[in-house]
């Protein structure tokens, strides 16, 4: 190199303009020229990567990266769309070092191990580029495979000379960036270990200066990252640098090794001061932290930016943190964006490769041990499904370059090779399409085994589920999309709920009927509902009620265990082979010879089953619950003189009812059942459905035997439907009974429609439970139940619902006295047809502090139990399920977003809501003591549901995502 070079841009010619702005060097251009040698050597990958990373840091909100432990992991990262790669010293120590041994992160491995891994990564990326280019018509890869690598140089493996040599080795390996930490190399520890010892500030500056010198000598604008471990290090080698003096605890004395002790109280400020000293010598600064805290990051960034406003930072999103413990899901979603806005431009997960490899292999091995080849087939199904996202490793021969070397072979032999490897391989024969044929494919399960599930999750049953979902799930999703559009039109005042003029002829035609009612369903005067746990199934069927509705929906928390154990319990109950022994009292529970008729409520159309995937997409919860039950039990029930009977929840339109009708027909044909064998009752629990009663019955006329007044969800739907319209503000929910005008009109309209069509009109739920410790309160509660059931029987309902076996005798007495026949379908109501105004009239009442607090308390209590796997919860002497929690949170949302006033004149605002949630959370936590609970998570969800801009459709969908993410 000529001595004519005057500045470092002439020495590092590839550096873009402004690259070294603010960078300080304690050496001269002449020093670089003297050390470079007489021949220029190009380091193409390192130079290209450094400039690319520099550009990304200045154009992206932040650059995310994962730690790669192998070359293939890096290939998959780039294929998935990541633009940078991290090389972790911890991962090198654990399983990627040149000694071939396993070490903790204490710089015990050979110093060349990191550069060797960088070489392997770049070679793998090069091969991926070559393979893709070889297959392309223009011989160019579709993407830039050479993602810049930021590599871990630990503490330099020694002094400044070691840092110099290590930087050169990383540049030769093609690294784009390198970071050095300010620990003592001989005592080096992982950033999340104890016993870390800092070196003096001046000594680390020499290390940074040495690494910059090495990059300049190589002519590469390598990104240098200075890491400080001052936040959690409590020891310092020497007090030679006066800049370290304010942070030394001289009173504590020195350690046995002679190290100085550091003050605990000044850790963040020490990081800031060290970062300010390092800033002129580095491109980015990294403060290693002991927990993910936005406040600490902001304090650090603002402290450095006071002196160096343009300095960028790196952030370790460490696997050593328990992320869920520190951050809520909503906080996690915005965590990296907030960091990026503060200047943390390079954000990485150090040990991603190690944990991804360890967990995925353990999970496969565990499942392989239990399921054999079904486990590996499940992995393949996941691979097939990922192909639509760009995944290609399912074709592993092609992935590693077999086709590429076939091209080499053909080139060598002039195109005459007869020994190419990919042609004729099993991969070519079996993996030409992303998935197996439909006849061969079943579906993939992502959850753990449940004891006894082998009799439920049989290959034939899974194939039936696959067929049901393939046939009907796309239509379900379209109908859900239509729901959203209808709601948007109401929100924007483009449409108001009304009767459909196009079906007026159908409504007025008195000549058609619903389905013929089976003998064992003629008398339904008392129906008991509840979840499908084993004890509940036995007690409910033995309760004296005519019908037991086994519930997979509102009174169920849809964990995988609950869904599978529920199916197992119903399978056994259908065969009169169910028993239960209480684990503490040892009391035995068995099924009586005479018991209730069984009906099953699957989940609503809106709920997915995320543990069962087809093409990596969730299946329908409705079809899962319905499909498994009908597949295993339909013929057994028919043989007993009964049949497969269902309750259908959450329908909003006749189109959704028609979907169920088509599912029934398909199922009957598929399972060899006579048309009309499947019977159903539809819950009218949405305001929009009340405008389509006749249309819903007509859609299901071959199967339907009744409608039911789902009162709690109906009130919730009223709030949700008119969520954007202030004039529909409701009073406290306990002021809205079935005698409220819009509720009474709806229930009478249900009776009128049902009896006209020859089917049952079922009354609503009595959620009260016996109050054993207070006879006066119990008598009062039972009096309310009695009055409600008398109203139902007088109006013409053919039966009613209760939630507790203790209410069965009371409800039965009322209907026995007032309905001597099995039903009163012959009782036709002659009242005038309802108008849209009748069905939407706004109830009068007040909003009280007690009602406001009760809504918060009920929703918190319910969500706490729901997240723990229990969907039916006794609260305040009522059996609460999802419906009552939905009313409560929806009212809170409505009141907050429309500035509703309490009767004492206070406006319900965000402050009052958050304050009350916090107070109720604290009260519940104190009361819970050491009992396992999910109250904090429940509070997070409740605050989200109440304060969000747009009301969520169902709280159970968001809460379900949390269950699935936690492996339940």
Curated annotation (Swiss-Prot):
| Region of interest (Isocitrate lyase), residue spans | 1-443
Region (Malate synthase) spans which residues?
Answer: 444-968
List the InterPro entries.
ICL/PEPM, Isocitrate_lyase, Isocitrate_lyase_ph_CS, Malate_synth_C_sf, Malate_synth_sf, Malate_synthA, Malate_synthase_CS, Malate_synthase_TIM
Coiled-coil blocks: none
Keywords attached to this entry:
Glyoxylate bypass, Lyase, Multifunctional enzyme, Transferase, Tricarboxylic acid cycle
Q: Name one GO molecular function term.
A: isocitrate lyase activity
- Spell out the Gene3D superfamilies in the cross-references: Malate synthase, domain 3, Malate synthase, domain III, Phosphoenolpyruvate-binding domains
State the EC number(s).
4.1.3.1, 2.3.3.9
- This protein's pathway: Carbohydrate metabolism; glyoxylate cycle; (S)-malate from isocitrate: step 1/2; Carbohydrate metabolism; glyoxylate cycle; (S)-malate from isocitrate: step 2/2
Can you tell me which family this protein belongs to? Answer: In the N-terminal section; belongs to the isocitrate lyase/PEP mutase superfamily. Isocitrate lyase family.
Query: What's the protein called, per UniProt?
Result: Bifunctional glyoxylate cycle protein
């Amino acid at each position: 190199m000529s001595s004519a070079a005057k500045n470092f841009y002439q020495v590092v010619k590839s550096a873009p303009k402004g690259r070294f702005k603010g960078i300080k060097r304690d050496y001269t251009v002449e020093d670089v020229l003297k050390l470079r040698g007489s021949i220029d050597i190009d380091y193409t990958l390192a130079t290209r990567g450094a400039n690319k990373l520099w550009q990304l840091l200045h154009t992206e909100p932040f650059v995310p990266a994962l730690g790669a432990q192998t070359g293939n992991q890096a290939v998959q990262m780039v294929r998935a769309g990541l633009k940078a790669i991290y090389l972790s010293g911890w991962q090198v120590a654990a399983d990627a070092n040149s000694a071939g041994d396993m070490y903790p992160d204490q710089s015990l491995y050979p110093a060349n191990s990191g550069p060797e891994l960088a070489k392997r990564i770049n070679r793998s990326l090069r091969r991926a580029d070559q393979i893709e280019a070889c297959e392309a018509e223009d011989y160019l890869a579709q993407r830039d495979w050479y993602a810049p690598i930021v590599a871990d140089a630990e503490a330099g493996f020694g002094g400044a000379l070691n840092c110099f040599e290590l930087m050169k080795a990383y540049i030769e390996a093609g690294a784009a960036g390198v970071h050095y930490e300010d620990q003592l190399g001989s005592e080096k520890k992982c950033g999340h270990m104890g016993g870390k010892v800092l070196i003096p500030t001046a000594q680390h500056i020499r290390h940074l200066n040495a690494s910059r010198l090495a990059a300049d000598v190589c002519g590469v604008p390598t990104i240098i990252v200075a890491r400080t471990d001052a936040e959690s290090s409590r020891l310092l080698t020497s007090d030679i640098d006066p800049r370290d003096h304010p942070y030394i605890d001289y009173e504590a004395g020195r350690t046995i090794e002679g190290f100085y002790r550091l003050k605990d109280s000044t850790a963040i400020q020490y990081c800031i001061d060290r970062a300010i000293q390092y800033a002129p010598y580095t491109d980015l600064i990294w403060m290693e932290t002991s927990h993910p805290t936005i406040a600490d990051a902001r304090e650090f960034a603002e402290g450095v930016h006071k002196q160096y406003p343009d300095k960028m930072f790196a952030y370790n999103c460490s696997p050593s943190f328990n992320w869920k413990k520190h951050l809520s899901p909503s906080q996690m979603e915005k965590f990296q964006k907030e960091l990026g806005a503060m200047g943390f431009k390079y954000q990485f997960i150090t040990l991603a490769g190690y944990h991804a490899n360890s967990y995925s292999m353990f999970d496969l091995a565990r499942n392989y041990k239990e399921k054999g080849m079904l486990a590996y087939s499940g992995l393949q199904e996941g691979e097939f499904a990922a192909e639509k996202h760009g995944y290609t490793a399912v074709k592993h021969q092609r992935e590693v370059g077999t086709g590429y070397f076939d091209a080499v072979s053909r080139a060598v032999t002039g195109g005459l090779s007869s020994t190419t490897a990919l042609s004729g391989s099993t991969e070519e024969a079996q993996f030409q399409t992303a998935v197996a044929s439909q006849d061969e494919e079943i579906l993939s399960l992502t959850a753990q085994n449940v004891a006894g599930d082998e009799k439920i999750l049989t290959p034939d049953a899974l194939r039936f589920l696959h067929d049901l979902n393939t046939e009907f799930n796309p239509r379900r999703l379209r109908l859900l999309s239509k729901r959203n559009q209808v709601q948007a039109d109401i929100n924007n005042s483009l449409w108001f709920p009304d009767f459909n003029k196009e079906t007026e002829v159908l409504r007025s035609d008195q000549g058609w009927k619903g389905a013929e009612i089976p003998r064992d369903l003629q008398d339904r005067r008392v129906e008991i509902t509840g979840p499908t746990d084993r004890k509940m199934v036995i007690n409910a069927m033995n309760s004296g009620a005519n019908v037991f509705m086994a519930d997979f929906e509102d009174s169920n928390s849809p964990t995988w265990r609950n869904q599978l154990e529920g199916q197992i319990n119903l399978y056994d109950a259908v065969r009169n082979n169910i028993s239960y022994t209480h684990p503490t009292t040892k009391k035995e529970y068995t099924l009586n010879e005479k018991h209730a008729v069984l009906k099953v409520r699957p989940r609503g159309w809106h709920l997915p089953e995320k543990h069962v995937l087809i093409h990596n997409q969730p299946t329908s919860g409705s079809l899962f619950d319905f499909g498994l039950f009908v597949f295993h039990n339909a013929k057994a029930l028919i043989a007993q003189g009964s049949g497969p009977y269902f309750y259908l929840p959450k329908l909003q339109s006749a189109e959704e009812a028609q979907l169920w009708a088509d599912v029934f027909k398909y199922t009957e044909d598929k399972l060899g059942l006579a048309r009309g064998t499947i019977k159903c009752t539809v819950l009218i629990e949405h305001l929009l459905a009340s405008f389509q009663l006749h249309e819903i019955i007509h859609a299901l006329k071959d199967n339907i035997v009744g409608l039911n007044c789902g009162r709690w969800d109906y009130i919730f739907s009223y709030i949700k439907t008119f969520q954007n319209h202030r004039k529909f503000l409701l009073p406290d929910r306990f002021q809205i009974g079935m005698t409220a005008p819009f509720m009474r009109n709806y229930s009478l309209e249900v009776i009128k429609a049902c009896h006209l069509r020859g089917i049952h009109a079922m009354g609503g739920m009595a959620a009260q439970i016996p109050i054993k410790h207070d006879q006066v309160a119990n008598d009062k509660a039972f009096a309310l139940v009695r009055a409600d059931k008398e109203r139902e029987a007088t109006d013409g309902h053919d039966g009613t619902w209760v939630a507790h076996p203790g209410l069965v005798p009371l409800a039965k007495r009322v209907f026995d006295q007032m309905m001597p026949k099995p039903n009163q379908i012959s009782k036709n109501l002659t009242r005038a047809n309802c108008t849209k105004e009748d069905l939407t009239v706004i109830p009068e009442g007040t909003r009280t502090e007690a009602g406001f607090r009760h809504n918060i308390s009920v929703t918190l209590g319910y969500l706490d139990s729901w997240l723990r796997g229990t969907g039916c919860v006794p609260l305040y002497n009522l059996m609460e399920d999802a419906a009552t929690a939905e009313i409560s949170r929806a009212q809170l949302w409505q009141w907050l977003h429309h500035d509703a006033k309490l009767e004492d004149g206070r406006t319900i605002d965000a402050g009052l809501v958050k304050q009350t949630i916090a107070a109720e959370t604290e009260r519940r936590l104190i009361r819970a003591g050491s009992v396992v609970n999910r109250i904090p998570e429940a509070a997070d969800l409740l605050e989200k549901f109440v304060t969000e801009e747009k009301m969520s459709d169902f709280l159970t969908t968001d809460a379900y995502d949390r269950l699935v993410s936690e492996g339940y």
